[in-house]
Amino acid sequence: MQEQATSSLAASSLPSSSERSSSSAPHLEIKEGIESDEEIRRVPEFGGEAVGKETSGRESGSATGQERTQATVGESQRKRGRTPAEKENKRLKRLLRNRVSAQQARERKKAYLSELENRVKDLENKNSELEERLSTLQNENQMLRHILKNTTGNKRGGGGGSNADASL
């Protein structure tokens, strides 16, 4: 009776032949959940070969452990050590970008200075026009004051001026 229970338990935990042939994904999920001690201890080398007896069935998918390690090694080499030619090329590109940027900055500065010079000329012209107008208005004001002084003086001095003084 116990033998039947254990055999039915074993049969229920293992996938049927139809499940195995229909798709490899459920088979991989089951294999990933159960790892043997050998699979846990195995560490891939940087050369791309796995240490241990054989690669397991779960690595036979689209990206194997070797491909993964080679991809990470390739990325780390690309990031870490650049060849002298790459370094020189990168330096030359940086210098060229810097040269172009400096030239653009010089051109912007030149345009800004010419704009400022034009503005200075315009303001100087406006200032001279305003100074001329001020001078004209001051002369006109002084002339009007003089006329006002003469007209008020004539009225006072003419005949009504003595009466105005006598009444006080």
From Swiss-Prot:
Bias-annotated ranges (Low complexity): 7-26
Observed effect of gene inactivation: Reduced sensitivity to abscisic acid (ABA) leading to impaired ABA-mediated reduction of seed germination. Abrogated induction of DHU1 in response to UV-B. The double mutant shw1 hy5 has altered root growth, hypocotyl length and hook angle similar to the single mutant shw1 in the darkness and far red light (FR), but shorter hypocotyl in WL, red light (RL) and blue light (BL). In addition, shw1 hy5 is recued for gravitropic root growth defect observed in hy5 single mutant. The double mutant dhu1-1 hy5-215 phenotype resemble that of the single mutant hy5-215.
PANTHER family xref list: TRANSCRIPTIONAL ACTIVATOR HAC1
Upregulating conditions: Accumulates transiently within 2 days in response to cold; the proteasome-mediated degradation observed after accumulation is triggered by prefoldin co-chaperone complex (e.g. PFD3, PFD4 and PFD5).
Post-translational modification comment from the UniProt entry: Phosphorylated by CK2. Shows a stronger interaction with COP1 when unphosphorylated. However, phosphorylation does not affect its susceptibility to be ubiquitinated. Ubiquitinated by COP1 and/or CIP8. Ubiquitination takes place in darkness and leads to its subsequent degradation, thereby preventing activation of photomorphogenesis signals. Ubiquitination and subsequent COP1-mediated degradation is triggered by SHW1 in the darkness during seedling development. Ubiquinated and degraded in response to cold when reaching an accumulation peak after 2 days; this proteasome-mediated decay is promoted by prefoldin co-chaperone complex (e.g. PFD4).
Keyword terms: Abscisic acid signaling pathway, Activator, DNA-binding, Nucleus, Phosphoprotein, Phytochrome signaling pathway, Transcription, Transcription regulation, Ubl conjugation
Gene Ontology CC terms, in alphabetical order: nucleus; protein-DNA complex
GO molecular function, one term: DNA-binding transcription factor activity
Keyword Cell membrane listed: no
Tissues of expression: Expressed in root, hypocotyl, cotyledon, leaf, stem and floral organs.
Location in or out of the cell: Nucleus
Region (Disordered): 1-93, 149-168
Domain bZIP: 88-151
PROSITE patterns on file: BZIP, BZIP_BASIC
Stretches for region Basic motif: 90-110
Bias (Polar residues): 58-75
GO biological process, one term: regulation of abscisic acid-activated signaling pathway
Family the UniProt entry places it in: Belongs to the bZIP family.
Region of interest: Interaction with COP1: 35-46
Compositional bias ranges of the Basic and acidic residues kind: 28-44
Record's subunit section: Homodimer; homodimerizes via the leucine-zipper domains. Heterodimer; heterodimerizes with HYH via the leucine-zipper domains. Interacts with COP1 WD40 domain. Interacts with BBX21, BBX24/STO and BBX25/STH. Interacts with SPL7. Binds to SHW1 in the nucleus. Interacts with HDA15 in the nucleus. Interacts with PFD4 in the nucleus and at low temperature (e.g. at 4 degrees Celsius).
Listed name of the protein: Transcription factor HY5
Chain residue ranges for the region called Leucine-zipper: 116-144
Cited function: Transcription factor that promotes photomorphogenesis in light. Acts downstream of the light receptor network and directly affects transcription of light-induced genes. Specifically involved in the blue light specific pathway, suggesting that it participates in transmission of cryptochromes (CRY1 and CRY2) signals to downstream responses. In darkness, its degradation prevents the activation of light-induced genes. Involved in responses to cold conditions probably by modulating the expression of several genes and triggering anthocyanin biosynthesis.
Gene name as annotated: HY5
Broad class of the protein's primary localization: nucleus
The keyword Transcription regulation belongs to this UniProt entry's keyword annotation: yes
Organism from which the protein derives: Arabidopsis thaliana (Mouse-ear cress)
